[in-house]
């Protein structure tokens, strides 16, 4: 011990320093917790403010209306990051731990993965997939893609969900919206504004992922329009996919995806269309595969040869927008507007006038049908490959669903 140093005073000084350090750490913890809480509230609030609102009149989606014109705010990006990280964690457990996921990693899958990760700027990607259960998205994509991709919102897909399912409640709409899910009105046709809002995301060079059957089909076969209810004339699939492809100034790369087994995770009552269990099932096998990119050049060229040039829809470039704070007067369409660029460019403004110009002609609808049939052929080819590869293990209706069908004399159980 040093001479001249009072031990009691030394201990008192040490206690004071320790107490001060403890108080400082407690204050820092409170600041950290408060900051995290404030950030959380801010991100949730941002997601709430910018959520798609299909129930407004007219339907509103402010972020989609400005797609390609401005960057999303940091808070909105943070909200999306939180949603995709937590979603990836939860569905990775469901697909890879509680169930078995088998992926066919061939050249078509590797092409699909490369397009998701490093697609040339401005080139849109459109994936079309069969629909077996309410958790196909994000379940199948989380199973197919590495976590380093699914945790990056800027790389991930935009998709659509029926407004009466995903956007019925404000809280649900806020969550789905931050997860890059957009509303669609089933049965409202290809000219609805909600499809137009979704289409803007494709025009900006984004990745759009859709289920063109329009509903879940759990029997093992590609669904869509029932046999005898317009299927022979119009095909199985919805025509929205055809419209999105037909009018794009840069034809999107279209990749078909096909999966089996998801119906066993979330069985649906085939008579009432209600989910049979509140939580997904475990102990099942899910398979997934990607197909060859689909070409539509011959269909587009044939249409233009017979009916003239197709209208090509494009978003305004940032250089066409008036400077920040300008009320207008700059060259090009104001924010929220875009144009069909063809031999005679047609500007599509917002509001009712834009809805009128968005309407399709009879000849264009015929083209949409032909494109949708081409997509149908690709998905049926993948289904045939899956049946051949899986043989007797190819899944049909879930056991509970098959039992309900059998009880009501409608058969079922096999694909």
Can you annotate each of these PLM segments?
Residues 105-106, 188-192, 234-238, 361:
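A conditional alpha-helix N-cap/helix-loop micro-motif detector
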Residues 170-174, 206-207, 218-362:
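A cross-family acyltransferase "interaction/gating" segment
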Residues 388-411:
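Short, highly charged C-terminal tails/helix-capping segments
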Residues 2-8:
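Cytosol/nucleoplasm-facing, intrinsically disordered, low-complexity tails
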Residues 143, 188-196, 200, 239, ...:
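Short acidic (Asp/Glu) patches
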Residues 4, 15-146, 152-155, 163, ...:
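Membrane-anchoring hydrophobic helices of lipid-metabolizing enzymes
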Residues 121-129, 205-214, 252:
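Generic beta-sheet signal
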